[in-house]
Every structure is written in C-alpha cells, then in structure tokens.
Amino acid sequence: MFITAALFSLKRMPRIFMLILLFINVFLLAFLLLGCTTDTETYSSTYLVKYSFNKSSAIYPLIKSSYSSKNFTGYEDISVRTGYLSLCVDVDNETACASRSDLTSFKNITAVDIYTVNSNSSSTTLDIVSLAAEYSNEIVHPYILIASIILTIILFLSLLYIVIPGLLGKHFVTKFNLVLAPVLALLWGLGAMWEHVASKAGKSLVEKASMGIIKADIGLKASAMTWTPFTFFVIVAIGVIGLYFRDLNEIIEAVDSKV
C-alpha cells in the first residue's frame, strides 16, 4: 500500500512541481500589476521606472528656488514611481499614490519654472508627475500582463484537474495544456520584452530629452518579477510537452505488450 502510494505520488511529482511554479507566477504577476497602487512599502516599491530631479544638474538650484518661492519646501527631492496602473509620488518622506488616469490631486502642484524669458515674461515649466504619467499611459500597457494572469490561472486549474485521480476527459485536457503552455510562455515572453524595452526607453529618452535635469532609475524588483515568471513559464511548457510524450510512449508500450 505504501509503495503504491509512493509510486503514485512520484509519477505526479513533475505536474505538482509545475503547479507550484504556476502558483508562484500568479502571485508574482499580480503583485507586478498592482505595483504603485497603494502607499504601502510592498506595493510602492514595485515600480517600472522612478523619476527624480538630478541633483548634479546645473538647473537643480533653480528648481529648488522655484519650489521655495511657492512654499513647497522639499519638493526638489520629489520622486515619481510608475507602475502598470498607478503612480506613486514621494515628497518629504510621504508617499501618495493615484491612478495614472486621474492625477488631479497633483495638478498644478509639482510643475516647476525652470527658465524665464525676460522679453515677454513667459516661462518654461517642467512637471515631473505629468511626464511620468505620459510614460505610463502611452508606453506601458497592462493588457498582456492581465491576459497572462488569466491564462496562468486557467493552466493551473487544468493541470490540477489532471493530477486529481478518477476524473474523466483528461486526454482532452492534456492536449489543451499542450497548446496553452507554449502559448502562455510566448505571450509573457512578449510582455517581458515589451516591459524591458519600455523601461530602457523611459530611462534613456527622458534623461536625454531633459538634458540631464531628470534622473530615471529602472525598478530592479519589477524586472525580477517580470523575468522570473517567464523562466517558470518556459519550464512549465517544456514539462507539459515532455510529460505528454512520456505518457504517449507508455501507452504505445502497453499496447505493444498486448499484441
């Protein structure tokens, strides 16, 4: 009895291992999606790109002076963290987060005058929050991430269905997984590459376009939470394909032994 149970469990260990990987992926991708949605450290520290004023820039003293003239002391040290759905603004050791589509709470507060033309008294303003929102709205899109989370849950449930003994239709579910697992790996591979390119572009273009006034830092935590699930998806896809052919060979050998 014990040996039979041990062999039963051992045969299902690869699928159980894949279930664990998919379970981890659901949480990693969900945390990645919810990054910067609240001011708690767990979520606000999960960001794609963080923007702040470059203290070594020659314009930094003007920025500090401009904020001081508006009685916004400490705003020269402002930093804006961008996520898939929201932004978090850090000012004077306080964090406030808002949806990237509704930044009315920050309107006309973070804009700073950096240059004034004496001939017509016009000024050039720089709003670091609006810039971060533009990056988040126009370049970063959560749709692939959301689709990947949904498909991961479906794949997890279908693999769990196969592991449970006594259920019918496992042959069809196995073929379904044979298609879904590689598709999911390719889909999130595309999403991971898009996030990587978007983060690199958001850093490089903003720093150069602002002539070094703004500094951008890529979120290492978000990068790790992007590429780790992709690695797990590849492992699961290889495992699903390998188990399919293993089970197929066992069926062929069983049929040949009866002939």
Label every PLM stretch briefly.
Residues A5-L10, L126-I144, A209-A224:
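Juxtamembrane membrane-interface segments at transmembrane-helix boundaries in membrane proteins
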Residues L7-L21, Y67, S79, T152-N177:
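Cytoplasmic juxtamembrane interface segments
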Residues L29-L32, Y43-N137:
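A surface-exposed beta-alpha-beta supersecondary segment
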Residues L22-C36, L155-V163, W188-E195, F233-L243:
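Membrane-embedded alpha-helices of multi-pass membrane proteins, especially ion channels
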Residues A30-F53, H196-L205, F245:
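Juxtamembrane interfacial secondary-structure elements that flank transmembrane helices
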Residues P14-I24, N137-I154, V173-V183, L187, ...:
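Physicochemical signature of membrane-embedded alpha-helices that form the seven-helix bundle of GPCRs
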Residues F2-T40:
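Hydrophobic secretory-pathway targeting helix
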Residues G169-V259:
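Alpha-helical transmembrane segments forming the membrane-embedded cores
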